[in-house]
């Protein structure tokens, strides 16, 4: 069941109270790809890609349940993570770190598959709960299932074949107009198929990015909220 209570229990079971989840996208700008209007404002040194400062989205444990819910509400059917063997080491405080040089994360929609390639770092505390989950995305691809466009492509091929087999000048103006109208309709149908569902230049849905942006604002105000609570001081 995709409800907030389920995701709260999930996060409490697998994430530590001070857990953070980071999504670094600094490699997009370095590769020359400039996402339009969606580039995040959070910055930090990224150990995975070496960007200093790196750029991306940072989420705290408090907002993760809502983010998970919105992700699946916005059309994601399934997420799959593939990774090679990790480099494992332990920090002085007892935390266990797993670093994957090659990781692939796939988001499966009904009519689209978004494949992200990058590096992954996961830090577990002594209770084996996640304190840091960091994915550094190098690029992503948007793949459309073959079954989705096969019918339109086949019809376009048939129309082109029929048109080529007519002798030059043998088509009447009405026949030519009919062929052009059919071709335009098929192209519009194919374009509509390729445009749905809508993801932005980072491969995220609009609703999910909006929630990420709200979480950025909440994170930036967290110290102020804690200070107000500790000193019993209101906003006015």
Regions found by a protein language model. Give the residues of each.
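Terminal "cap-and-tail" regions of soluble proteins that handle hydrophobic small molecules
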Residues: 1-236
